[in-house]
């Protein structure tokens, strides 16, 4: 069923959806619509006036990232807030690692899988949204001759297993994406540590 935009505009829909999450977990979420990527950023309590309220910024890429519907992007980023993505612990874990960016991207793939599994289970209509998005993003993955762990995880997550089925450690990466589903807030951290050696 198509939403009547004369009754509820896109902006109102986004604000109301954001408001539900804010109320559910006592958070303040600043919603921005800027160029670039969709993201969720946590602002530590030391920077906040109200120590009982967690503060986040969520950006919804405008124009939209190819293959990602803007409302689906909002639901995904709100999932990071709702399912308590461990922003501070992963930064502490990685510390000053020379591979910080690479490791963080791998962790993020696992964390995205974790939060979307919860959203898909608790809000059944979202499953189709996320599957459609993953498939669209998979079609955008360029073929590679060699497979690093990040590419392998993305290909599996985006329904493009055939591209990496012969990759070294394929089975470990596939298992990791299964193991992280429906885990607690530290599930992606634990799974990340279990595959770091690969």
Model region roles, listed by residue range:
Residues 1-198:
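Short, functionally important secondary-structure microenvironments
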């Amino acid at each position: 069923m198509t939403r009547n935009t004369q009754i509820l505009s896109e902006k109102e829909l986004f604000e109301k959806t954001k408001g539900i999450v804010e109320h559910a977990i006592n958070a303040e979420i600043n919603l921005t619509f800027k160029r670039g990527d969709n993201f969720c950023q946590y602002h530590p309590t030391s920077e906040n006036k109200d120590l009982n309220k967690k503060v986040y910024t969520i950006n919804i890429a405008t124009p939209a990232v190819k293959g990602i519907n803007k409302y689906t992007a909002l639901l995904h980023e709100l999932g990071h807030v709702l399912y308590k993505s461990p922003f501070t612990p992963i930064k502490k874990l990685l510390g000053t690692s020379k591979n910080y960016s690479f490791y963080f991207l791998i962790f993020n793939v696992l964390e995205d899988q974790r939060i979307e599994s919860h959203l898909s289970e608790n809000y059944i209509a979202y499953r189709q949204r996320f599957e459609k998005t993953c498939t669209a993003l998979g079609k955008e993955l360029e073929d590679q001759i060699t497979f690093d762990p990040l590419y392998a995880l993305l290909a599996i997550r985006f329904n493009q297993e055939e591209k990496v089925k012969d990759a070294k450690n394929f089975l470990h990466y596939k298992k990791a994406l299964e193991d992280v589903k429906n885990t607690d807030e530290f599930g992606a951290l634990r799974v990340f540590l279990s595959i770091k050696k690969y």
